[in-house]
Swiss-Prot record:
Ranges for region Disordered: 117-147
Keyword RNA-binding: yes
Known catalytic reactions: Endonucleolytic cleavage of RNA, removing 5'-extranucleotides from tRNA precursor
Organism: Thermobifida fusca (strain YX)
Entry EC no(s): 3.1.26.5
SUPFAM superfamilies tied to this protein: Ribosomal protein S5 domain 2-like
Name recorded for this polypeptide: Ribonuclease P protein component
Cysteine disulfide links: none
A GO molecular-function annotation: tRNA binding
Family per similarity comment: Belongs to the RnpA family.
Length: 147
């Protein structure tokens, strides 16, 4: 079970994470992570990271939704320590989440968490040089030969 101090309960916290946080989506879930900037009057270093879950009726009936939520909560219990202090994370389940087994759901959650915690400007799988090389190759291949 996720610790009570790590649970997000207030609507304002959900809204903040969803409106101002970094987002990443996978086919079974999406996540939004908001990391507050430390201010002199409100340092976030001692605040624990908090996690909230959103599992809509599109996922399935109540039993299915609750099972998905329990799985996500258990997965986040193991991962909450890797989140920045004072951060707000919202995990939203999509209908595909009900069809995945525990390990597949864990893989998608890990992938989404890596994407939102990665420093800005870093690509997930390709570097800028490889993107430019790919686009140059595509242009060269697609050109018509001159006569």
């Amino acid at each position: 079970m996720l610790s009570p101090r790590n649970r997000m309960r207030r609507r304002a916290d959900f809204d903040t994470a969803l409106r101002h946080g970094r987002r990443a989506g996978r086919n079974a879930l999406s996540v939004a992570l908001f990391v507050p900037q430390d201010t002199p009057d409100q340092p976030g270093g001692d605040a624990p990271p908090r996690v909230g879950f959103s599992v809509s009726k599109a996922v399935g009936k109540a039993v299915v939704r609750k099972r998905v939520q329990r799985r996500l909560r258990h997965l986040m219990r193991e991962r909450v320590g890797s989140l920045p202090a004072g951060s707000l994370l919202v995990v939203r389940a999509k209908p595909q989440a009900a069809l995945l087994d525990y390990s597949e759901l864990a893989a998608q959650l890990d992938s989404a968490l890596r994407a939102v915690t990665r420093p800005r400007g870093q690509s997930s799988h390709r570097t800028r040089a490889s993107r430019e090389a790919t686009s140059a190759h595509t242009t060269a291949v697609g050109e018509q030969p001159t006569q």
